[in-house]
Amino acid sequence: MALGLLAGCSSVPLERSAMQPAQLLPLATLAPPVCAYRLDAVSDRRAAGTAAGSLGAHAFSLDDAADLVRQRLMANGFRDDPALPALSLEIRQLYIAANQSSKVPVAVYRVSVDGGPPTILRSHAASVNWNGTEAESQRAIARALDDVDLQLRQMLDARCGSRHAAD
């Protein structure tokens, strides 16, 4: 009897896998920006290194988050023109966590424009945890990145509008 109870306490080992950047590209295309910005620097400052959380029996890693975010932002209208205002971006967190009923993908950026004071942007993309599959996890991270990228665009567009009003 005791052996049967102990067997029920064993856990399934986590399947370790790397998130695929092709699965994390923008799910939605943003409207063109109000005014242009240069993507000066993207750095990966995640305290967890390449670890990107877990969902169900899957534990994830993401090796080159800075390149992924750079690709996503360049696809959404950032430029390499040195005459434009410069955006510096640090990736502070990028992972997925879950409980029985919901999954919480987290993306946190620390951004500054032209060396100004930094702003923290955090995704708000929690959703129902259906099956805990690898594909579901990657879609959730892509949605979190879409959310924080949209917040960044809105912040920059508002800054651009106030900059033009001062002219």
Each model region followed by its residue ranges:
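Sec-dependent bacterial lipoprotein signal peptides
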Residues: 1-10
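Short secondary-structure boundary motifs at beta->alpha junctions and helix caps
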Residues: 47-59, 116-164
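Surface-exposed short loop/turn segments
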Residues: 10-16, 75-119, 123-135
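A sequence-level detector of short, solvent-exposed, charge-rich linear segments
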Residues: 3, 88, 92, 108, ...
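Sec/Tat-exported extracytoplasmic proteins
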Residues: 69-77, 95-98, 152, 156-160
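A structural "domain/chain start" motif
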Residues: 9-67, 157-167
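Short alpha-helical linear motifs
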Residues: 40-44, 109-112, 145-149
